Amino acid sequence: AILVSLIFFDLLTKYLIQDNLFLNQSIKINEYFDLVYVQNFGVSFGLFSGYVSHWILILIALIVVILIFYLFIKSDKQLEKLAYFFVIIGALSNIIDRLINSYVVDFILLHYENFYWPAFNLADIYITIGIIMLIMSFFIKSKTVK
């Protein structure tokens, strides 16, 4: 139920952005945060945009999800399992978005003065949470090994 809920929430926010903003339109929320409608044809942060077919990106993402799912099954650590779960949720949601649109909708834009972080979405946040948790589990594991 959590998996479906998080994917639904990500896809819903992407739909609402597409339905209410024009492409590249930005709405200032506060000094550091804007909502913006960006079509990401590449991978994270728009890398490889226009250089690789969306079908290739989908195939690569599916292979990565399968590998991470294997790690999820093999792991006996709760923190690792939760971390893999978040990465899988984020990846699946972006895969679904790419299947629907041929691109991924990004809409969260963080900035400070003249520095702008590339736009991202909730699925990217799920993936980032999972990666941070994996790093934490690595440090916890290495600390207990000593």
What are these model-predicted stretches?
Residues 1-146:
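Alpha-helical transmembrane bundles and membrane-interface segments of multipass inner-membrane proteins
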